Design a protein with these regions (language model features):
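AAA+ P-loop NTPase catalytic core and its hallmark functional loops
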Residues: 1-174, 191-194, 198, 202
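The conserved phosphate-sensing helix
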Residues: 174-184
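Short, hydrophobic/amphipathic alpha-helical patches that form generic packing surfaces
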Residues: 182, 202-207
Length: 207
């Protein structure tokens, strides 16, 4: 922990048109007007992890519940289970054996506040551990950030946001997923009213 290696981290975002062919393997048009078999991003990353078994690899899927998960993962629903890691199966388009190595970790991120999105079905859900990520206003990192800005008005704004979030959590029609996140207020080197006005004007609809 604490060491970043971009070669061992891959991040993608699912969407409604994302497919097994994009993720694992499939035929794609080539320059000659024909089709050729091409490997998807997860396939390539698994091979990379397999070639370096002494290192951990992390595959991050943003908006995981935006895609058709059963269609995207296909037969890999079995291989991503702990009990089947390292075991081989044949993929849909080839007789080549394929495996998801034990040193590869899949992290899926989803927005539970967007009720227009599909929830993860049980077949895939039971293959993941679920953790709720709450706004980080009370973390040591954000507290240090507040100390760096050292502005009483900013501190009062954050206190107000915490009160609003408490109200949101208690509202049965909303809940934790609708809380205002800390990222709106980050990455500012010094506090000024111009920044605050821009923040509120640009993000008032989402807030």
């Amino acid at each position: 922990m604490g060491v970043k290696d971009k070669q061992r981290v891959e991040m993608i975002q699912f969407h409604q048109n994302y497919s097994y062919e994009d993720f694992i393997l499939g035929y794609k048009p080539n320059a000659n007007g024909g089709f050729e078999l091409k490997h998807g991003v997860f396939y390539k990353f698994c091979k990379k992890a397999l070639n370096t078994p002494d290192k951990d690899f992390f595959f991050i899927i943003d908006e995981i519940n935006r895609g058709n998960l059963s269609k995207i993962f296909g037969e890999l629903l079995m291989l991503i289970e702990n009990n089947y890691r390292g075991k081989e199966i044949k993929l849909a388009y080839t007789d080549e054996p394929f495996t998801v190595p034990e040193n590869l970790y899949i992290i899926g991120m989803m927005n539970t506040a967007d009720r227009s999105l599909a929830m993860i079905d049980y077949a895939l859900r039971r293959r993941f551990s679920f953790f709720e990520m709450n706004p980080g206003f009370l973390t040591d990192g954000f507290k240090n950030y507040m100390d760096t800005l050292s502005n009483e008005r900013f501190n009062k704004i954050i206190s107000g946001i915490l009160e609003i979030n408490e109200f949101i959590c208690k509202d049965d029609s909303l809940g934790n997923g609708f809380c205002i996140g800390h990222s709106y207020f980050c990455n500012q080197k010094e506090f000024n009213l111009e920044w605050l006005e821009m923040l509120l004007n640009l993000n008032s609809a989402t807030l």
